[in-house]
């Protein structure tokens, strides 16, 4: 359910692209250092966005280093780390753990059992350190599980579960920016959930799996409705972002919010157009 909140590379200046990659590689290294290969496998662009956002807002002191890794064994890569990197790594692992645990409980996925088992002890320590975030993740995933069992087609209800989860993860400190960050995370979380459901719909229909968009899909204006909902979520999220006094890396953040979040949507539209053209060609033969 991740990977939607990323950069639009063609629209990003080279210096900003290098810096984004340095934040991303810094998170990857922190996950490997603290949680091993399994932790590293939880790496997402979405949490990289959270690092850049919170680092900009709280003016975190960045540490720039150069390191090699398995992906780049020859040339050293620039890596940025700060106090937010640690927080994002912890949240990444905590969310992955509860998600794997939920996968095993609901669908008996072996990957959930094995992955959750490997992360269990470390995730429990993180949960003790961050009880508010841990509670939010558990409760949100439980409600999402309930939505699936009930085959709920209330999009706002199911998306709201993930929205509340992300809202709590975005709140690094309970201070004057808490409510703005909470609203920003809420709408971004809803966007991620709906985008994921939209991307998975065809497969879910074939496999008869739960998807909150099945009823909406029956409408003639389904595509237009989805685009309007997604636009609304990102518009609300971006409006909250603009209330924050972020100056550092603001061009990267705006690139993600105004362009990058649409990468996967645009790919889906391109694929649907190509499939439609191919079908028309076959019918005309």
Residue ranges and their predicted role:
Residues 1-183, 190, 194-231, 239-252, ...:
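Acidic catalytic motifs of isoprenoid enzymes
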């Amino acid at each position: 359910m991740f990977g939607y909140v990323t950069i639009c590379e063609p629209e990003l200046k080279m210096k900003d692209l290098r810096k984004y990659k340095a934040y991303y590689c810094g998170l990857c290294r922190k996950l490997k250092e603290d949680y091993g290969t399994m932790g590293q496998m939880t790496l997402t662009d979405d949490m990289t966005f959270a690092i850049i956002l919170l680092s900009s807002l709280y003016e975190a002191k960045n540490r720039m280093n150069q390191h090699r890794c398995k992906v780049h064994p020859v040339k050293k890569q620039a890596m940025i780390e700060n106090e937010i990197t640690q927080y994002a790594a912890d949240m990444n692992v905590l969310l992955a753990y509860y998600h794997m645990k939920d996968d095993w409980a609901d669908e008996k996925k072996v990957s959930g059992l094995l992955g959750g088992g490997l992360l269990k002890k470390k995730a429990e320590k993180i949960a003790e350190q961050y009880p508010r975030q841990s509670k939010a993740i558990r409760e949100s995933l439980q409600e999402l599980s309930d939505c699936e069992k009930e085959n709920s087609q209330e999009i706002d209800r199911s998306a709201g579960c993930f929205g509340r989860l992300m809202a709590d993860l975005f709140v690094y400190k309970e201070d004057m920016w808490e409510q703005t960050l909470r609203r920003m995370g809420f709408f971004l979380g809803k966007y991620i959930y709906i985008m994921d459901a939209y991307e998975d719909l065809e497969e879910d229909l074939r496999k008869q799996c739960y998807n909150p968009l099945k009823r909406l899909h029956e409408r003639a204006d389904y595509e237009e409705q989805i685009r309007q909902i997604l636009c609304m979520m990102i518009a609300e999220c971006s409006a909250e972002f603009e209330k924050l006094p972020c100056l550092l890396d603001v061009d990267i953040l705006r690139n993600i919010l105004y362009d990058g979040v649409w990468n996967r949507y645009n790919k889906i539209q391109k694929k649907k157009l190509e499939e439609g053209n191919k079908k028309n060609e076959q019918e005309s033969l």
